[in-house]
Regions:
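Membrane-targeting and insertion segments and their boundary/processing signals
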Residues: 1-5, 9, 32-39
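Ca2+-coordinating acidic residues in Ca2+-binding motifs
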Residues: 13, 30, 61
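A short, Lys/Arg-enriched interface patch at domain edges and termini
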Residues: 55-72
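Residues at alpha-helix termini
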Residues: 17-18, 38, 69
Length: 72
């Protein structure tokens, strides 16, 4: 498996990396839920410019995700 890279990711692509056994829509839901349920993560994402309708995650946002969830 290729080493995970911190880069801009389409939201759905990163969601599927974290939830590879889920269908696309389910992976999106679980990923969003995880952001809300992980203490401090939602606030950190918003501080990096994340909004509910964000389609592409920036490198800074991906760093926050990895900080809270680890690499996919």
């Amino acid at each position: 498996m290729e080493k995970f890279k911190i880069k801009d990711y389409p939201f759905g692509e990163l969601a599927q990396l974290y939830y590879p056994d889920h269908k696309y829509d389910s992976a999106l839901r679980h990923f969003r839920d995880e952001m809300h349920l992980t203490r401090g993560m939602w606030e950190a994402m918003v501080a990096q410019g994340y909004k509910e309708n964000t389609k592409t995650l920036t490198r800074a946002q991906v760093r926050v995700i990895v900080q809270f969830l680890g690499e996919p």
